[in-house]
């Protein structure tokens, strides 16, 4: 090997061992002089029929893997933000630690993450990938208990697990090994970040192994809301029993974490949207409308003064318990694998949702057809009529979640080189929802906004404690879903170089639910109290949802090995996305059909890695819902198609230097979408790429690695009509990792160190709403720094 970096050389030489799918001790085969270990040797388990997995070079699909070091080097601000290292994926992390919008390969959606499934040790955390106000990355926190991440794009995923046609993100936990190990990590940073991570594992005797770990963190947040924006933690444990021919393991995880959720703020837009700047009094990189003035509120939700106490600090968080396990066994030529997962808990959203652009207070008062005056709700005197104000809703969404999943597979070699796998997947899940959407407040358009009360001269009362309205939607609903699927997969090594895999899946989904009817009332019966004249109330009567759907999915893949350094693959699949709870509630009952085609190249030596994938996909029956600028609640169903090219790779030309990168070119268009046919699929850039140079030094007392990542995000459109253009932007992250001796590690990193003002979304709740150069949008966070010190044993 030509590198002076023993740590890097070792990582290549034992790639297969480090990424082995089961927890039994693996022995790495030494690399001979005429055989180079490459990333193609790494064993992956996601998207494979058997629990043993297969080498990357033999996989006829696109998959990205990341070790703990690579995860740390990505400087992620959240679980969703970590996905920026995956080509073909666009994650919008600007909402904070949770509640991201994640898009995959031009697959159409207005937000959330309907084409992303989060797995823990191969089991989906929650079977439906997205509910309104809940995308699956919200349910997971990355910490030092994670051994690696595997991200499968398309490929064979429509056949296995929950049949996700888009992106499957599998976080694989560390398990106990023969040698005890552990770590303690302390992290600090700007915005008063304080965090501790712990991990410990080892043998218990008689083939039993354990691991425990978790974290606790508190911070003022990437945008300081005048209270702890992110506060909470997680605890995990695994227990494993190993035999010569199998393994049984269990895990438990409790997550109780609250995260402030950030939505659009006013910005200044000039030069046809190419030049963005901060709105006066509200810094685009660090500012937020959130503040202590309305952190704790009493929402008026019913007659006779009925109120609901809510706290913004609870944010978009989770209080979730997860319990699961897996059993892998080989006997008499048969292989049995079973995975199960149980989840129970709550995932609320208490957040501020903005609407139209700011205006003068005087103009706001005049809109009532009367003169009047205004004062701060919590003291501070009269508010000047020239003060810029806006209306924003204090939304309260409660979700109670429960689910159970089980994935059973039975495999046997039928003849030399041909292995057949049959399996069954079962999921039972529910969500109990209570929503109060609306609750509009009149706020000063400034950092840490303040509520304003208006007194009209004609005697009408426009506000109550700064609230100009109550809920426009009071939703009470209880949903239950059940999915049953049977699948078959055949892997056939036609020759030493040619490998074929085929698969089919039949699935049936049954959904029932009760949605309470609503009515709109004047809560106090007094038309002069304007703030409660149009209040949505849930009634005792309900509307029944009862729908059964079934579908067949299939896939075929071919992998051709050119030599030990190069292979080609082709893949075609046809999958579905069943309508979710919220789709069925809104009358969107069609099953979405997804067809995908892929061609790829995988190439690697000790000097370079290269993964190229060309893809094409088509969608039918894709639903869309949005509030347009004219007040129309627009819903539609249409089609789309996308084509693109993904690249992922690295080059190591000399010494400890490496230049890694990912990128995607995407052309995604709507089809059969009324007047929007031919428009670019919303919120997804045509081009994005990331380049990461790094250098590694051996030192007398340890080693040092420095790295930086330059990211470019191309222009996008915030809405279906392509009327809100989001300009391109670039940013720079930096970091360094120092090992001192065998035990100490120091890591320092900075994200967006150039303090770039980049926009991830416009105000999709009111598309096109912009006046006088003022634009409602959600920018990325400004410059952030953090440093950690770890001790390992």
Task: Locate the predicted segments by residue.
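Acidic/polar loop-and-plug regions of large Gram-negative outer-membrane beta-barrel proteins
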Residues: 240-242, 247-322, 348-395, 449-479, ...
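N-terminal periplasmic accessory domains that precede
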Residues: 79-82, 101-106, 116-119, 136-139, ...
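Structural signature of Gram-negative outer-membrane beta-barrels, strongest in the C-terminal barrel
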Residues: 399-403, 413, 417-429, 442, ...
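C-terminal beta-signal and adjacent terminal beta-strands/loops
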Residues: 620, 658, 711-719, 737-793
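Transmembrane beta-barrel wall of Gram-negative outer-membrane proteins
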Residues: 181-183, 188-292, 315-329, 505
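Extracytoplasmic beta-strand/coil segments of soluble accessory domains associated
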Residues: 30-32, 48, 52, 80-124
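Short acidic/polar hinge/loop motifs at secondary-structure boundaries
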Residues: 124-153
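Gram-negative outer-membrane beta-barrel transporters
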Residues: 496, 609, 616-618, 635-721, ...
């Amino acid at each position: 090997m030509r590198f002076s970096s023993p740590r890097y050389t070792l990582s290549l030489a034992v790639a297969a061992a480090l990424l082995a799918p089961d927890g039994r001790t693996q022995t790495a085969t030494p690399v001979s002089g005429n055989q180079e270990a490459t990333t193609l040797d790494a064993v992956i388990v996601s998207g494979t029929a058997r629990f043993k997995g297969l080498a990357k070079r033999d996989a006829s699909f696109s998959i990205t893997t990341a070790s703990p070091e690579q995860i740390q080097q990505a400087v992620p601000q959240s679980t969703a933000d970590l996905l920026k290292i995956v080509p073909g994926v666009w994650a919008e992390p600007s909402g904070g630690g949770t509640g991201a919008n994640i898009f995959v390969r031009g697959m159409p959606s207005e937000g959330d993450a309907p084409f992303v499934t989060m797995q823990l040790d191969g089991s989906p955390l929650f079977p439906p990938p997205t509910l309104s106000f809940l995308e699956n990355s919200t349910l997971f926190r990355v910490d030092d208990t994670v051994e690696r991440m595997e991200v499968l794009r398309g490929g064979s995923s429509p056949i296995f697990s929950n049949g996700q046609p888009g992106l499957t993100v599998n976080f694989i936990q560390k398990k106990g090994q023969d040698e005890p190990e552990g770590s303690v990590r302390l992290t600090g940073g700007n915005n008063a970040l304080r965090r501790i991570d712990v991990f410990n594992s080892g043998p218990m005797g008689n083939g039993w192994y354990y691991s425990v770990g978790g974290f606790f963190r508190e911070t003022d947040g990437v945008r300081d809301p005048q209270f702890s924006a992110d506060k909470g933690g997680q605890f995990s444990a695994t227990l494993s029993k190993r035999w010569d021919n199998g393994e049984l393991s269990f895990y438990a995880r409790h997550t109780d974490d609250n995260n402030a959720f950030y939505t659009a703020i006013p910005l200044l837009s000039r030069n046809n949207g190419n030049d963005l700047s901060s709105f006066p009094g509200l810094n685009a990189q660090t500012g937020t409308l959130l503040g202590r003035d309305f952190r704790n509120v009493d929402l008026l939700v019913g007659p006779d003064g009925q109120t609901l106490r809510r706290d913004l600090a609870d944010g978009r968080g989770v209080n979730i318990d997860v319990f699961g396990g897996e059993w892998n066994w080989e006997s008499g030529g048969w292989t049995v694998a079973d995975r199960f997962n149980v989840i129970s808990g709550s995932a609320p959203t208490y957040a501020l949702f903005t609407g139209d652009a700011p205006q003068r207070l005087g103009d706001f008062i005049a809109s009532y057809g009367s003169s009047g005056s205004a004062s701060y709700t919590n003291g501070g005197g009269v508010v000047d009529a020239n003060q810029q104000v806006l209306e924003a809703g204090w939304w309260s969404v409660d979700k109670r979640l429960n689910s159970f999943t089980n994935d059973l597979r039975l495999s046997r070699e039928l003849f030399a080189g041909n292995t057949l796998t049959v399996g069954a997947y079962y999921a039972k899940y529910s969500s109990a929802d209570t929503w109060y959407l609306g609750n509009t407040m009149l706020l000063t358009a400034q950092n840490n906004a303040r509520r304003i009360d208006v007194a009209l001269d004609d005697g009408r009362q426009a506000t109550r404690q700064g609230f100009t309205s109550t809920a426009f939607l009071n939703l009470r609903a209880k949903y239950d879903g059940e999915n049953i699927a049977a699948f078959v997969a055949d892997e056939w090594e036609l020759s030493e170089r040619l490998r074929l895999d085929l698969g089919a899946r039949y699935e049936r989904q049954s959904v029932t639910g009760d949605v309470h009817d609503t009515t709109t009332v004047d809560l106090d019966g007094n038309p002069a109290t304007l703030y409660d004249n149009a209040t949505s109330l849930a009634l005792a009567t309900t509307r029944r949802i009862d729908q059964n759907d079934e579908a067949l999915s299939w896939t075929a893949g071919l992998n051709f090995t050119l030599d030990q350094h190069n292979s080609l693959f082709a893949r075609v699949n046809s999958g579905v996305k069943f309508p979710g709870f919220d789709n069925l509630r809104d009358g969107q009952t069609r099953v979405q059909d997804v067809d995908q085609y892929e061609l790829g190249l995988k190439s690697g030596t000790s000097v370079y890695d290269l993964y190229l994938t060309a893809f094409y996909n088509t969608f039918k029956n894709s639903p869309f819902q949005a509030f347009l600028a004219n007040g129309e609640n627009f819903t539609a169903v249409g089609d789309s198609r996308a084509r693109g090219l993904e690249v992922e790779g690295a080059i190591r030309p000399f010494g400890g230097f490496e230049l890694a990168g990912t990128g995607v070119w995407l052309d995604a268009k709507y089809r059969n979408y009324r007047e929007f046919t031919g428009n670019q699929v919303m919120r997804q850039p045509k081009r994005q790429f990331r380049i990461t140079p790094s250098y590694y030094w051996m030192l007398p007392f340890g080693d040092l690695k420095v790295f930086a990542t330059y990211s470019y995000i191309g222009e996008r459109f915030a809405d279906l009509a392509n009327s809100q253009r989001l300009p391109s932007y670039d940013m720079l992250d930096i970091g360094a990792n120092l090992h001192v001796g065998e035990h100490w590690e120091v890591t320092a990193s900075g994200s967006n160190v150039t303090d770039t003002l980049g926009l991830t979304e416009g105000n999709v709740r009111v598309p096109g709403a912009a006046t006088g150069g003022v634009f409602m949008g959600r920018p990325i966070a400004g410059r952030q720094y953090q440093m950690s010190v770890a001790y390992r044993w």
